């Protein structure tokens, strides 16, 4: 009976939790455990004057200085909100990472590049307030799911956004992308409106901005993703490798678009080893206190791609 309940809960998250169709019930199930646990949560801190320029902070309860993770939610740049990813903040904060999840303005209120600029502004706020958060301003990892992974990659790979916001590139020590559209080709009327002239694919594709100065990167993607093709992850991986950047890639057979994020919830953690792989990566890239030294040593670090054989827990 206990196993059956677990399967039903996991199924609710995975069946109803695909990017564009996330139901209130699936998020409710995923986030119930995030209401408890050994972390502090602070909601709705303003990083700008607009209604959606707000962020939530999930922090370990101890008083030590911790690395910072800024996580951007998905939603096709048209929907989604930070509260839906409370499970992500809880999963990382209970493991020693101050996790900040911002909202950002969406279409039709804004178009590209305004939501990327909002994201840069949120990172700038995090760095400016790092001491108050008990975070290290020079150990920041950018992370996101789906559209949020696109924005995290844009910030990590195109330094102009963060530099204009006052964030030095050396403070970004890692990038984690879950199921992101890194070689975006707008294929609907809505997306063509969001990513419209005068901008072109050279402006909105993270793969276009890859250099040997890219931060160490972890890319996770389900091979059965029918929302964002895993070829996006493969193209970004190949671009990073061709420039001598450090990239670790995990491709999950039989897993879809929601699974990479759902694996951070208690009810669906067995879907992929994404949480364990992310924690291992975060541990490596944030271990060095001198972020400037980390930035100077990015070139020549090994890359790897793993197709992970998966077995569901019974």
Go through each PLM region and give its residues.
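N-terminal cap/lid segment of alpha/beta-hydrolase-fold proteins
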Residues: 24-63
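Mobile cap/lid helix-loop segments that gate and shape the active-site cleft of serine hydrolases
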Residues: 34, 50, 177-209, 215
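Short beta-strand element of the alpha/beta-hydrolase
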Residues: 65-75
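Catalytic nucleophile-loop/oxyanion-hole region of alpha/beta-hydrolase
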Residues: 80-84, 88, 100-137, 267-269
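Primarily recognizes the serine-hydrolase "nucleophile elbow" in alpha/beta-hydrolase
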Residues: 121-190, 202
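Short beta-strand/loop motif that positions the catalytic acidic residue
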Residues: 219-221, 225
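Conserved alpha/beta-hydrolase "acid-adjacent" motif
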Residues: 226-235
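C-terminal catalytic histidine-bearing segment of alpha/beta-hydrolase fold enzymes
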Residues: 234, 241-314
């Amino acid at each position: 009976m206990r196993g059956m309940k677990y399967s039903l809960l996991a199924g609710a998250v995975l069946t109803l939790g695909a990017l564009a169709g996330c139901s209130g019930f699936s998020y409710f199930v995923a986030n119930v455990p995030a209401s408890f646990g050994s972390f502090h949560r602070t909601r709705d801190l303003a990083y700008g004057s607009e209604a959606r320029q707000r962020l939530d902070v999930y922090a370990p309860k101890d008083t030590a200085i911790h690395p910072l993770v800024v996580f951007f939610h998905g939603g096709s740049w048209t929907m989604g909100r930070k509260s839906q990813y409370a499970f992500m903040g809880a999963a990382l904060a209970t493991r020693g990472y101050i996790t900040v999840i911002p909202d950002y303005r969406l279409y039709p209120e804004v178009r590209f590049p305004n939501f990327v600029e909002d994201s840069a502004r949120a990172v700038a706020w995090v760095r400016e307030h790092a001491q108050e958060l008990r975070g290290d301003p020079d150990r920041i990892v950018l992370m996101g799911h789906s559209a949020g992974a696109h924005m995290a990659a844009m910030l990590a790979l195109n330094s102009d956004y963060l530099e204009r916001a006052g964030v030095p590139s050396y403070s970004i020590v890692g990038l984690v992308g879950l199921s992101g559209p890194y070689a975006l080709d707008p294929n609907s009327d809505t997306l063509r409106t969001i990513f419209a002239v005068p901008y072109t694919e050279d402006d909105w594709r993270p793969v276009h901005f890859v250099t040997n100065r890219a931060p160490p990167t972890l890319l996770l993607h389900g091979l059965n993703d029918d929302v964002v093709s895993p070829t996006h992850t493969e193209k970004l991986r190949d671009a990073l490798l061709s420039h001598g950047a450090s990239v670790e890639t995990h491709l999950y057979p039989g897993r879809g678009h929601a699974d990479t994020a759902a694996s951070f919830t208690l009810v669906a953690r067995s879907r992929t080893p994404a949480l364990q792989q992310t924690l291992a990566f975060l541990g490596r890239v944030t271990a060095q206190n001198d972020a400037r030294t980390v930035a100077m040593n990015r070139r020549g670090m090994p890359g790897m791609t793993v197709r992970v054989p998966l077995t569901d827990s019974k």
